[in-house]
C-alpha cells in the first residue's frame, strides 16, 4: 500500500490545495493532509478550524484524512508508515525552494517528494492572497472551497 503526505499550514485551504489533494489521491492508496503548526506564526484560523475546513472540503476523497503535525515533515511521514511527500508547485521560485527541501528530505530520511504542477487556473492562488483580497472586500469565491469562503467572510465580518 502506498501513502503520501501533503503538508502545509493551509491558513486557509484554497482550491489550489484541493486540486493537489485530488491529484495525490488518484495516485496513492492513502493521502494524509498534515496541517502543520508553526509556533512562530499566528494564523487567521486556529488549528482546529483549519482541519475542519479541509475535512469539509474533501468529503469526496475517501482515501484522504487530515491530521495535525509539528516538527520535521519526514518524521511525520515515517511515524505513519507512509512513503512520500506531495507538493504543489506554482512558480519557478516554488520549485527552487521545494527542490532543496526534497533533496534534504531524501538525504535525511530517504523520503521521496513528488511535485505536482499547479493547474493553470490556480497558478496565482495562495492563502495569503485570498485573505488579503477578501479583507479588502474582494470576491474570492473562485479561489476557495465554499465552506472556507463562508468561514473567511464570517471571520472578517466579525
Curated annotation (Swiss-Prot):
Entry's EC annotation: 2.7.7.3
Function: Reversibly transfers an adenylyl group from ATP to 4'-phosphopantetheine, yielding dephospho-CoA (dPCoA) and pyrophosphate.
Pathway(s) served: Cofactor biosynthesis; coenzyme A biosynthesis; CoA from (R)-pantothenate: step 4/5
Compartment annotation: Cytoplasm
Site (Transition state stabilizer): 17
Residues annotated for substrate binding in this entry: 9, 41, 73, 87
Subunit structure: Homohexamer.
Known cofactor(s): Mg(2+)
Annotated GO biological process: coenzyme A biosynthetic process
Annotated protein name in UniProt: Phosphopantetheine adenylyltransferase
